[in-house]
Regions:
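Bacterial N-terminal signal peptides
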Residues: 20-31
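A domain-start/cap signature at the N-terminus of enzymes
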Residues: 32-71, 83-84, 89-90, 98, ...
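Short substrate-entry loop that stabilizes the transition state in hydrolases
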Residues: 64-112, 209-213
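Alpha/beta-hydrolase active-site loop
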Residues: 125-148
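Alpha/beta-hydrolase fold nucleophile elbow
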Residues: 150-160
Length: 280
């Protein structure tokens, strides 16, 4: 009967050494991956507001549980959605220390397009849609204030088109909660009489065929008068001008060569503007 071959101690030791080395490398990769994870939580949150389920994409730095944290709301335009708005603008990368909220609108009749209300959007005036979106804003902010340490002197809102008109509505009806606002591709002269001085940024596309640049420049002139802004302004960034204010409410006007869009080139400017404003 043949003897079984004796195990090769040298080969066994080499196998064990290699196996151990692979294990160590794997553990190192995993630990580095875990260390590289941002100290944040992000995802979709839901609330029931007056019987209707509402949702938003929210980015929350973990430091918000212990440190006063600014909050920025970003509202999509008519027919838009929270996913595209969140991923296209990546405010959380530009301001990782802030809470970023991108709510989802509901089916809403538009003023310039979609009069039937087959696409998502926001209420246009006080009392419209039973003020569902004003209540939604209040609910989100209230829940964040319960769960996080919100810096109430640094709450900001920005939006595009119909979402920017809703920003104007928030300015008119939630002014005491807001430090500053930024509107892209919007105009609503009917709300002007309801506004109090507030730091504001207006983003205008020279090629906007839906909300005419002339309409938006009319808003700019009204905002400058409301905020008692100086003339002429000073450069804020490329294509952007800042106007100082006698009442502490400066204005920035960014005129880009594009059309009816919230351009990615505006993102850093909006965040820079917001970072420089704190409500007294």
């Amino acid at each position: 009967m043949k003897e079984m071959p004796k195990p090769n101690k040298y080969l066994n030791s080499r196998f064990i050494a290699r196996f151990t080395m692979v294990g160590l490398i794997f553990c190192l990769i995993i630990s580095q991956h875990m260390l590289a994870q941002p100290n944040t939580t992000a995802g979709v949150r839901r609330w029931k507001v007056n019987g209707t389920m509402r949702e938003a994409m929210i980015y929350v730095p973990l430091s918000a549980k212990t440190k006063p944290t600014p909050v920025t709301f970003l509202f999509h335009g008519h027919g838009g959605n929270m996913q595209d708005m969140f991923h296209d603008h990546t405010f959380e990368k530009l301001w990782p220390e802030a809470i970023i909220v991108v709510p989802q609108g509901l089916m809403t009749p538009g003023t310039l397009v979609d009069r039937e209300g087959n696409r998502s959007g926001w209420q246009q005036s006080l009392g419209d849609q039973q003020d569902r979106d004003l209540h939604f804003f209040d609910t989100i902010l209230g829940s964040l204030e319960k769960e996080c340490v919100v810096d109430k002197s640094r709450i900001y809102v920005t939006g595009h088109s119909n979402g920017a008109k809703f920003v104007y509505l928030l300015w008119a009806n939630r002014a005491d909660a807001l430090a500053a606002v930024a509107a892209s591709a919007a105009a609503d002269t009917q709300l002007l009489a309801q506004l109090k001085p507030k730091p504001v940024m207006q983003i205008i596309g020279r090629g906007d065929r839906l909300v005419k640049p002339a309409w938006q420049l009319r808003m700019v002139r009204s905002f400058r008068q409301l905020n008692q802004c100086s003339s002429p302004g000073q450069p804020f960034a490329n294509l952007a001008t800042m106007y100082s204010s006698a009442v502490g409410s400066p204005m920035v006007v960014y005129v880009h060569p594009g059309g009816h869009v919230y351009p990615a080139t505006a993102d850093a400017l909006v965040i820079s503007f917001f970072k420089g404003i704190k409500k007294e």
